[in-house]
């Protein structure tokens, strides 16, 4: 924009040079100034703290003062022009303090910085400037403008200081705890997300390059970094200091390619789902052992870029906004979810199948929006009108085009996304859609020009006519998208978050472990903003692996005391106790030592063994004290895969937890935790978050209730799932083997929670918008009702079961939350059958069976290529219908006769269709 304003008769060469200069300036800010300020500020901090012995953040304060003084000095000198040498020195000093020359890491960054600073000083020196031609000289105005620009950028970025200030205040929510210049740098650099190759790098099957060193085969490091963390003090008198620890290590790969798009070894099946990968074999030297490695070809790599990253993850979103959207269900490439449509039948039928035969739940989806490509056509007209509107129009076109490109396709290139993203990413490209919307607006002017040129209309009548007609386009868009953007009357996030907290015991300052965003942030919101259940503590297991989060858990928050963690910070600081090996094979040796000491009759020998390993080496508190937290390196393991926890029976009785009826009043003396993964295989190590859970189990003594959100996966449950008792949206830790005792649900508490305490965010209101994420939580709530009802039926509490069924139907109605196999609808129908409520049961089963038939009918209407990729979904629905039919027949429902014939008919059509496509 600046170039075109200054040079009215700009040419292509000048435009490209201006674009290049713009890119250099952006790179200088993003990769020079932003990390450079952190880098130079870090050097000041290290010097003042480690060398001069001053307190934390003193060096940063000095740096800020020096940087501000340097900028002011430079602006003053370049404005007054009294002394050219001082002007050059002040400018170079400012650039150096901003860290722009120090690109890279470690020693190389310093060397590069010194070279750049020396060159810059030499170039700007008065003698050199005087000897140059006029066009190569740098004027004082240029230096002054540059310094003013950097000053404004620094002032803007100074807002990040609030992050450090807030973190230093130790607020209850303090992500990453960036309390100094080094942790702030990690925070700004998003280092927890890792890196990905962009222009050159590995493929998903590439192997790390190896070399033989000192007789060992080791991976070759491409580059490594170090970082500084605060040293933990061993005494209050010790001075503040930082210690250097290893940072991120990147390894060199033996097989690399240009523009690598398929690079993640964790997404190989997904890559192969998008591209038919044959690959080619390349030799790989495995320290003398030659093997062949199959990597994708460059063309296969490019095909994935176009098919997935560009088409599916950009143009699909683009068409959502300017052509139409199939529905708001997240798609992974399947034909029925998340695609773009137009509203024009013959186009849509060719793209995504016969839309008139769509299952009713897809037809009724509020995210089903059709624009008939009218915004797209207007945008294309505006694009061409601007591009062919004289020299000024061409210049404006390139400005809008680069805005469109840099906020759209350039982001696609930079993100290098893997398949199976956790959510739709259309928000990342909003700037690009805004840019195209400029062309949409210009399309009105383009149509006016067409009418004037070809219909010979006067300007005013043409403008009135076109404006009136084109106004219908945004009206159509608003009419289509209003219902799926209207959140009025919906309080799901607040209420469902409260339901998690309401599932917890009202006394005892309970703890609830969560893991994902949707079962954590609503709870934090309720505690932070609504002041709801501030006596409880929400603990996110994915953060519990970090030292900064453990710090927060050890502090009181709101009305909740600290969590029962007794470890000193030096024991869990980053790099310490990240994991502890499980070594059950040493159990025999330990048992032999105990037996030998016991049989020796020597009390001193037995006492020595107890002093070394504890009285019971496999009991949790002993393991924590004598093994995990031991100073002796050889004992820094877990010596068993079955941890024993002694049970304080009186504490259990005081705790308020339900004692299984099968036990009567008897409580076991101990419980065992089997250290297994979610597949039942023995674990080989426990990570820091799991160690913290064990620490809390050991110290809470059952008197402080501990819960696991039901949405946390088994892999994060520490093998405690056999001991859980569900009380709502959370399961309570107990010392009882509840699965064996048939006591996995406390029906009394759960009934009270669901029927009297839970709120449902307005999802019972007809017509309320429920998007996919909210629908998942609605499914969870219906499943919880189904679990409660099943337990009540087992206990013979039929009146309560019927009341819960009817209440679930009222609060989670099918007109907003359709019946589905995944949300407990089948279990509810069976309960209705068992209670003699055949009509209500038939209503649910009829909806489920009809839904399966609608999907299968639609799949059968697809063309061969579309049907081929949908066969798995067809088989899924036919299996569901078969199970539904069995349930109908079991309870002698009249529906079974009708659906039995339809099942046979559809299966026959499927068999003939499959044979025909082979």
Predicted regions located by residue number:
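ER/secretory pathway lumenal C-terminal domains and tails of membrane proteins involved
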Residues: 1-429, 436-509, 521-918
């Amino acid at each position: 924009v600046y170039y075109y304003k200054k040079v009215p008769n700009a040419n292509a060469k000048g435009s490209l040079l201006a674009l290049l200069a713009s890119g250099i300036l952006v790179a200088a800010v993003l990769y020079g100034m932003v990390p450079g300020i952190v880098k130079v500020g870090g050097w000041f901090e290290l010097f003042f703290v480690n060398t001069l012995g001053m307190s934390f953040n003193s060096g940063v304060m000095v740096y800020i003062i020096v940087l501000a003084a340097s900028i002011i000095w430079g602006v003053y000198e370049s404005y007054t022009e009294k002394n050219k040498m001082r002007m050059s020195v002040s400018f170079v000093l400012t650039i150096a303090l901003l860290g722009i020359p120090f690109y890279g890491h470690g020693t190389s960054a310093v060397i590069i910085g010194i070279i750049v600073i020396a060159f810059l000083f030499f170039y700007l020196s008065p003698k050199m400037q005087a000897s140059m031609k006029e066009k190569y000289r740098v004027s004082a105005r240029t230096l002054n403008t540059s310094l003013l620009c950097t000053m404004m950028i620094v002032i803007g970025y100074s807002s990040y200081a609030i992050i450090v200030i807030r973190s230093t205040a130790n607020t209850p929510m303090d992500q990453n705890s960036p309390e100094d210049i080094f942790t702030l740098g990690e925070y700004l650099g998003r280092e927890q997300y890792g890196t990905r190759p962009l222009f050159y790098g590995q493929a998903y099957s590439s192997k790390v390059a190896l070399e033989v060193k000192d007789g060992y085969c080791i991976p070759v490091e491409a580059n490594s970094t170090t970082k500084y963390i605060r040293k933990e003090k061993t005494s209050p008198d010790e001075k503040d200091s930082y210690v250097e620890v290893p940072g991120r290590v990147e390894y060199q790969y033996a097989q690399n390619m240009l523009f690598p798009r398929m690079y993640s070894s964790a997404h190989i099946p997904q890559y192969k789902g998008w591209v038919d990968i044959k690959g080619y074999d390349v030799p790989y030297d495995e320290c003398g052992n030659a093997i062949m490695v199959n990597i994708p070809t460059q063309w296969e790599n490019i095909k994935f870029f176009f098919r997935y990253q560009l088409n599916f993850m950009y143009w699909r979103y683009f068409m959502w906004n300017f052509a139409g959207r199939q529905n708001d269900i997240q798609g992974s490439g399947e034909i029925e979810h998340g695609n773009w449509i137009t509203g024009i039948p013959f186009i849509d039928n060719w793209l995504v199948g016969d839309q008139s035969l769509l299952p009713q739940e897809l037809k009724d989806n509020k995210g089903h929006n059709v624009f008939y490509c009218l915004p797209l056509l207007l945008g294309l007209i505006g694009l061409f009108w601007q591009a062919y509107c004289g020299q000024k129009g061409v210049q404006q076109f390139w400005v809008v085009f680069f805005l469109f490109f840099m906020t759209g396709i350039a982001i696609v290139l930079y993100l290098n996304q893997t398949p199976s993203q956790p959510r739709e990413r259309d928000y990342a490209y909003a700037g690009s859609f805004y840019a195209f919307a400029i062309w949409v607006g210009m399309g009105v002017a383009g149509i006016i020009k067409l009418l004037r040129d070809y219909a010979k209309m006067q300007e005013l009548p043409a403008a009135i006519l076109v404006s009136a007609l084109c106004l219908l386009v945004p009206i159509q868009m608003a009419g289509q998208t209003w219902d799926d953007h209207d959140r009025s009357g919906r309080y799901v996030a607040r209420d469902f978050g409260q339901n998690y907290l309401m599932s917890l015991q009202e006394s005892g300052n309970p703890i609830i472990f969560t893991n994902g965003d949707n079962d954590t942030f609503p709870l934090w919101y309720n505690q932070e903003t609504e002041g709801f259940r501030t006596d409880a503590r929400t603990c996110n297991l994915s953060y519990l692996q970090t030292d900064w989060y453990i710090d927060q858990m050890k502090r009181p928050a709101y009305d909740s005391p600290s969590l029962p963690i007794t470890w000193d910070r030096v024991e869990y600081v980053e790099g310490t106790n990240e994991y502890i090996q499980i070594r059950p094979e040493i159990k025999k040796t330990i048992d032999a030592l105990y037996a030998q000491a016991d049989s020796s009759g020597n009390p001193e020998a037995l006492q020595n063994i107890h002093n070394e390993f504890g009285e019971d080496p496999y009991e949790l508190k002993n393991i924590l004290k004598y093994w995990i937290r031991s100073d002796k390196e050889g004992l820094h393991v877990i010596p068993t895969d079955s941890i024993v926890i002694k049970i304080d029976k009186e504490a259990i009785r005081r705790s308020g937890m339900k004692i299984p009826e099968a036990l009567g009043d008897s409580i076991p003396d101990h419980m065992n935790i089997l250290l297994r993964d979610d597949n039942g295989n023995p674990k080989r190590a426990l990570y820091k978050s799991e160690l913290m859970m064990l620490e809390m189990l050991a110290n809470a003594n059952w008197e402080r209730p501990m819960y696991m959100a039901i949405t946390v996966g088994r892999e994060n449950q520490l093998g405690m799932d056999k001991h859980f008792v569900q009380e709502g949206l959370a399961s309570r830790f107990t010392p009882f083997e509840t699965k064996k005792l048939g006591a996995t649900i406390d029906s009394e508490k759960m009934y009270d929670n669901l029927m009297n305490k839970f709120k449902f965010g307005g999802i019972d209101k007809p017509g309320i918008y429920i998007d996919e994420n909210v629908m998942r939580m609605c499914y969870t709530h219906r499943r919880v009702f189904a679990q409660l009802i099943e337990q009540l039926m087992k206990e013979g509490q039929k009146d309560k079961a019927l009341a819960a069924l009817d209440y679930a139907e009222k609060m989670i109605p099918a007109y907003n939350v359709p019946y589905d196999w995944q949300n407990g609808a089948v279990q509810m129908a069976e309960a209705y059958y068992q209670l003699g409520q055949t009509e209500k049961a038939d209503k649910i089963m009829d909806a489920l069976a009809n839904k399966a038939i609608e999907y299968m009918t639609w799949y059968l209407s697809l063309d061969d290529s579309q049907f081929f990729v949908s066969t798995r979904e067809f088989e899924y629905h036919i299996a569901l219908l078969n199970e539904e039919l069995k349930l109908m027949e079991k309870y002698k429902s009249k529906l079974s006769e009708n659906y039995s014939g339809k099942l046979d008919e559809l299966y026959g059509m499927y068999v003939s269709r499959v044979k025909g496509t082979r």
